[in-house]
Amino acid sequence: MAVCYKARRFEVFKANVEFIETLNAQNHKFWLGVNQFADITNDEFRTTNTNKGLKSNSMRVLSTGFKYENLSFDALPTTMDWRAKGAVTPIKDQGQCADGKCKAGSNSAATITGFEDVPINNKGSLMKAVANQPVSIAVYRGDMTFQFYSGEVMTGSCGTDLDHGIAATGYGKTSDGTSYWLMKNSWGTTWGENGYLRMEKDIADKKGMCGLAMEPSYPTK
């Protein structure tokens, strides 16, 4: 039984490495790499390592409006990285979670008792919020490019069936002019850019890449 299991895992590993090498040979702005998910199928990946059910309704505060609404874009910094300001906790590994049992991945910096929502599908409002504090983000992370992401700015299309929580901890622009959101994940430092992900910021879809603009919120307490 153990031999069969190892043989099966090796076949999965080889198929995943082939996918990684094929994509990396194409003209993308980002690249993939072998990581802790290399010996599981994408179907297996989609049923684990998710923290669906990020916020309970009881944790939401009554909406009194978006508190950053009246900020001028001219007053916003052109780049932001909350890590440099000491406002981001170290990367953690949530382990293999399923069925909505992991809920702390995007808001682990402190004990949080309430949230306010950022206006949905509104990149400008999201930028105002992230310029002032880290923001909880829900995304779809079932795509294989998300599974094996290793560096640079992730571009392209992906789904919007939100199933995972990450935190927007900044934004910026690469030397070639590609704008991005800086995201903190909860899969350890062996995934992505030492546990972080950069996602393309200026795209046509108002929902944002992988639905990142659909359910943003920030802690109030």
Where do the model's predicted regions map?
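Catalytic-core signature of thiol
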Residues: M1-K221
